[in-house]
Amino acid sequence: MHKKNLKKSLIDKAKSLGFDAIGFCEACEVDEETQKFFLSWLDEKCPDYMDYLKKNLDKRFNPTLLLENAKSIIVLSANFFRKSSENRIALYAQSKDYHIVLKEKLKEISTLLEQHGGIQKLCVDTVPIMEKYFAKKAGIGFIGKNTLLISPSAGAFNFLSLIVTTLELEPDSELLDSCENCNRCIQHCPTQALSEYSLNPNLCISALTIEKQTPLNDSEKNLIGEKIFGCDMCLKVCPKSKYFSLPKIPEFQNSFEYDKSKSSLQDFADIAKNTPLERRLKNSTPKI
């Protein structure tokens, strides 16, 4: 099959699986400026409980070290926006664990690549690779001041997944868009964790309630307030995050519901099963 025909088949397959966008870029080394910015952030702001980000930096910056003879990266985006009455839990965590859902879909796309002799590495948020950097290069969206990937299809409400492949596929152009003079995410962050294009995890509700596994100190407890798991403020206030249609992937279309006045910890555990919240319950007991 001609490379252009293969690319079209991949696009059609991705759309049939419910992805909102798919883009292609070269499996190249991350540019020097981005590497320096990330290393500086690690030195100045990365807390001990996120030290995993300091590991495998060579692979994180160079996908050819993740997969020998890697030529291309396929980036896929899935919208997870939907209305929910539960504001104490990040929206992405109110449905089936995206790691499980997206990995199965990537396997289907990988099968198509294998038929053309490709060898692949599937990446769903657990592999050391600069997802947002390559999503930008593949034309999926741009990186906003809230440090998130912002796309035309879902604003900041994106699940990103990547396929690194040994097949050479025609790259797409980067999307020409930006935050311009907008600072809504910075202005509305409840803990002032954001500055332009940089996040301080030591102040971020999401980092404190998701990444930190040890008990919170009094100052951190004051920061998170009534939040249980994550925070969506910088996603919600972004003008690019308009009210889109429901996600095309069925597992992301509905949020779980529970009666706060009657719920017990066991009720909460039952509801959280197979969601990103399940990991939180294994490590500590949230206040519900």
Predicted feature locations:
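Generic structural signal of hydrophobic/aromatic residues within well-ordered alpha-helices
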Residues: 38, 42, 53, 204, ...
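Glycine- and acidic-residue-rich phosphate-binding/metal-coordinating active-site segment common to enzymes
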Residues: 173, 214-218
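Auxiliary alpha/beta "docking" domains used to position bulky ligands
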Residues: 1-178
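Short coil/turn linker and secondary-structure boundary residues
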Residues: 1-5, 30, 199, 263, ...
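Short, small-residue-rich loop/turn micro-motifs
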Residues: 78-80, 208, 272
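Iron-sulfur cluster-binding cysteine motifs and their immediate structural context
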Residues: 184-209, 213, 224-252
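Generic recognition of stable, solvent-exposed alpha-helical segments in well-folded globular domains
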Residues: 5, 9, 104, 177, ...
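Alpha-helical scaffold domains
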Residues: 50, 218-288
